[in-house]
Amino acid sequence: MRVAAATTLALALLGVVSEAQTIRVQWDRKVDFSGYRSFTWIEGTAAVDPEVNQILTEAIENELSVRGIFPDEAEPNLYVVYHASAREEFQVEGGYRTDWADSGAVTVASHLAGTLVVDLVDAGENRIVWRATATATVSGNRKKARGRIPSVVQKMFADFPPSAPGPP
């Protein structure tokens, strides 16, 4: 039960994040993103918590719509997909000591690391043209964690769309 609750908390994704939060964005530098005006969703790896999935979907749709890219299932330019995951990580400290009178205690600490990957896939070519990855240590209660999701997504899309490609 503890693991299930912890996993749900971690998948409340990047919730109350520590300073260890990292956002990485990659894109095809040959692509002109100004032509993308519509998208539809394709299935990815959903969070365990349905409410988290709804928050993620709304946050991503909001970031795209403020940039002039709107949902259109009939004729999308882009497919949007996200992958949410969490894993427990361990940190081991201590160990051998030079003083043989002391056993050299070992301390093991664990924390949850959450990852969110958002891919934008060119619908015509069926290939990823933009990817943002956010990773962070997740802590705090579920309500606070859920409340932080939109700001994490906003940071992921901060520089979207990328600048138009230069001359060859």
Language-model segments: residues:
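Solvent-exposed, acidic/flexible segments
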Residues: 34, 49-57, 109-114, 138, ...
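Residues at beta-strand starts and edge strands
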Residues: 4-5, 37, 76, 114
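Residue-level detector of anion-binding/catalytic polar loops
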Residues: 70
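Surface-exposed short loop/turn segments
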Residues: 23, 67, 76-129, 135, ...
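C-terminal partner/receptor-binding element of secreted or periplasmic proteins
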Residues: 136-168
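Bacterial N-terminal signal peptides
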Residues: 4-15
